[in-house]
Amino acid sequence: MITVFSGGTGTPKLIRGLRQILHDHEITVVVNTAEDLWMSGLYVSPDIDTVQYLFSGLLNTDSWWGIRGDSFETFHAMEKLGYTELLPLGDKDRATNIARAEFLRQGMTLTEATEKIAKGYGVSARILPMSDQNVASYVVCEDDSLMHYQEYWVGKRGNVNIKGVVRKTTDGLPLKTTPEVISAIEESDGVIIGPSNPVTSIGPILECAGVREALQNTFTAAVSPFIGNRPVSGPAAALMKAWGYESTSYGTWQVYKDVVDLFIQDVRDTAIEVPGAHRLDTMMTNEKKAESLAWDLLSYFPRK
């Protein structure tokens, strides 16, 4: 079994490649939930939904979010009434979020609700939220005010000067992971930290109490999301700078170096040298390239 740490864009492309090699039931995905939010009475978990739509064959792989061919009748109807959602939800996608919100209101944990929804979609892979706590990433603006990550990236398109990134739990308690996540790490043949944003996608997972300790005893590989000083996608460069790290593969390695046995850097990333890094083609522009990267990556894993 392989466990993958994932956000919502770069890593699902790698998971698509892994699925050409492994059976779905051999893959566990630990998913970032620090970009979740309550919206329109719904509990929206974008990264979890991207992963479960990928496994169920529903994902829109042009945008890498939402359901392929979904309609937006409800979203546009609300716009006419003067209410515009921060995150545009398709109608079928909305059904997922309605169900999740109701399950949580009934007293289910996010782990339980995720399992129930995945079962409904016929997913045999195991999809685990990183935590059952309600947690969010906030950027720290220049005036010291806090802005939810979704407002920063979706609402403001990242056009805000920031100087920090923090995590806040609703219950005010330290962020902790779940027993299911720890078991998945310990029982895996290895863990892959995918090429998602190190600050807002992978960072929250690693900050969950118990995760870094569990990784110390499991072979762990990480794939850099950077080529040069630019991420393949998303706002990782600005966020890394605000977090106090170089917006490069070297900066990413500094975030992960205490938990990784193998660090993968793109073959084109010639200006940056990371100590001990291995070079692979990490540009997953199509399914074949994703499969090729997955094969190469798994070849490094120790046989059990």
Curated annotation (Swiss-Prot):
Q: Which residues bind 7,8-didemethyl-8-hydroxy-5-deazariboflavin?
A: 49
- Specify the enzyme's EC class, one word: transferase
Q: Which pathway, per its entry? A: Cofactor biosynthesis; coenzyme F420 biosynthesis
- Which Pfam families does the record match to this protein? CofD
Where do the coiled-coil regions begin and end?
none
Reaction(s) catalysed by this chain, per the record, are: (2S)-lactyl-2-diphospho-5'-guanosine + 7,8-didemethyl-8-hydroxy-5-deazariboflavin = oxidized coenzyme F420-0 + GMP + H(+)
**What are the alphabetically sorted keywords of the record?**
Magnesium, Transferase
Q: What is its EC number?
A: 2.7.8.28
**Which cofactor(s) does the record list?**
Mg(2+)
Q: Which InterPro entries match?
A: CofD (IPR002882), CofD-like_dom_sf (IPR038136), FbiA/CofD (IPR010115)
Q: Which GO terms describe its biological process?
A: F420-0 metabolic process
GO MF annotation: an example: LPPG:FO 2-phospho-L-lactate transferase activity
Concerning Gene3D superfamilies, the annotation shows: CofD-like domain (1.10.8.240), CofD-like domains (3.40.50.10680)
Instruction: Spell out the subunit comment.
Output: Homodimer.
Task of the protein: Catalyzes the transfer of the 2-phospholactate moiety from (2S)-lactyl-2-diphospho-5'-guanosine to 7,8-didemethyl-8-hydroxy-5-deazariboflavin (FO) with the formation of oxidized coenzyme F420-0 and GMP.
What family does the database annotate?
Answer: Belongs to the CofD family.
What protein is this chain from?
Answer: 2-phospho-L-lactate transferase
Please give the organism: Methanocorpusculum labreanum (strain ATCC 43576 / DSM 4855 / Z)
Upper taxonomic classification of the species? Answer: Archaea, Methanobacteriati, Methanobacteriota, Stenosarchaea group, Methanomicrobia
What would be the name of the gene that encodes this protein? cofD
